[in-house]
Curated annotation (Swiss-Prot):
Substrate binds at residue 9. NCBIfam families: PRK05756.1, pyridox_kin. Keywords: ATP-binding, Kinase, Magnesium, Nucleotide-binding, Transferase. Its EC number is 2.7.1.35. Residues 44-45 are annotated as: Substrate. GO terms for cellular component: cytosol. This is Putative pyridoxal kinase PdxY. It comes from Salmonella typhi. ATP binds at residues 111, 143, 148, 181, 208-211.
Length: 228
């Protein structure tokens, strides 16, 4: 059984971040070590919420506790998702280095949560810059949506060919795999939910019917991808 250290958000009402990812990852056969970057009452798409952003040092202290009992060498992957602050990102990269020192085969899966194709960049100041400058080159796998792909590549992405080219530009900076988790307007059809997985040599495209969920779209599905 693979052990995944999942460092991302948590909501009490509903499901997002770790509260969305933990169950499906366990069902896929992974052992999840959830470490929350924020504890919110609900997802921010509701427009109002309560809760707190965890101090960056809290993340490091928790992981050090795992190291102190000799378990960090058994960590097979680190997943990072929603960040409450750019400072958290710096500590997460330190955790990635610590895990890889204990287990050189461990992978870093970065879900660079920054925005939404219809809403733009919606994260705390400095988070987008952190992902572009530091998380991208440190990651083994990175999973942007369309707007995040544009932010990371610094190019407009208008179609699938553009997306493949932008993904390959990211690969040249560090990651082995780029998973575009939602092509949105750059996909082949506005009636499909389309995804793209790109390596230096190959690219795979997959789609499914686009289901209309109304004003609040489901969130958190991509948070479980490291288990696959």
């Amino acid at each position: 059984m693979k052990n995944i250290l999942a460092i991302q958000s948590h909501v009490v009402f509903g499901h997002a971040g770790n509260s969305a990812a933990e169950f499906p990852m366990r069902r896929l056969g992974a052992n999840v070590w959830p470490l929350n970057t924020v504890q919110f009452s609900n997802h921010t798409q509701y427009g109002k919420w309560t809760g707190c952003v965890m101090p960056p040092s809290h993340l490091t202290e928790i992981v050090q506790g795992i190291a102190d009992i000799g378990q960090l060498a058994h960590c097979d992957a680190v997943l990072s998702g929603y960040l409450g602050s750019a400072e958290q990102g710096e500590h997460i990269l330190g955790i990635v280095r610590q895990v890889k020192a204990a287990n050189p085969q461990a992978k870093y899966f970065c879900d660079p949560v920054m925005g939404h194709p219809e809403k733009g960049c919606i994260v705390a100041p400095g988070v987008a810059e952190f992902h572009v400058r530091y998380a991208l080159p440190a990651s083994d796998i990175i999973a942007p949506n369309l707007i995040e792909l544009e932010i990371l590549s610094k190019h407009s992405v208008n179609n699938v060919n553009d997306a493949v080219q932008a993904a390959r530009e990211l690969i040249a900076q560090g990651p082995e795999i780029v998973l575009v988790k939602h092509l949105a307007r750059a996909g082949y059809s506005s009636e499909r939910f389309e995804m793209l997985l790109v390596t230096a040599q190959e690219a795979w495209h997959i789609s499914r019917p686009l289901v209309d969920f109304g004003s609040r779209q489901p969130v958190g599905a991509t948070a479980s991808y490291p288990a696959t």
